[in-house]
Curated annotation (Swiss-Prot):
Name the record gives this protein: CDC42 small effector protein 2-A
GN (gene name): cdc42se2-A
Record carries keyword Cell membrane: yes
Provenance organism: Xenopus tropicalis
Highest classification ranks of the organism: Eukaryota, Metazoa, Chordata, Craniata, Vertebrata
Lipoprotein in keyword set: yes
Family: Belongs to the CDC42SE/SPEC family.
Entry's localization field: Cytoplasm, Cytoskeleton; Cell membrane
UniProt-recorded Gene Ontology molecular function terms: small GTPase binding
Domain CRIB: 29-42
GO CC aspect terms: cytoplasm; cytoskeleton; plasma membrane
């Protein structure tokens, strides 16, 4: 007995080629524009309490560039992850 192969093109969808991401090297990255270093903020600074947050805000405002008066409600929850 012979084999009979029948191909239905209407039922087989061609798989789209995956999009290749363009590789970026250092020569494609420009210098920062309008960058102003105002403060160092570490994770310990924010966990030390609201006084620290307000002092960081005051320090950043004293450096300039923060002319608008914006207020924000900040809620922090401290979770103790130490066992025992």
């Amino acid at each position: 007995m012979s084999e009979f192969w029948l191909c239905f093109n209407c039922c087989i969808a061609e798989q789209p080629q995956p999009k290749r991401r363009r590789r970026i090297d250092r020569s494609m990255i420009g210098e920062p524009t309008n960058f102003v270093h105002t403060a160092h903020v570490g994770s310990g600074d924010l966990f030390s309490g609201m006084n620290s947050v307000s002092s960081i805000q005051n320090q950043m405002q004293s450096k300039g560039g923060y002319g608008g008066n914006m207020s924000a409600n900040v809620q922090m929850q401290l979770v103790d992850t130490k066992a025992g």
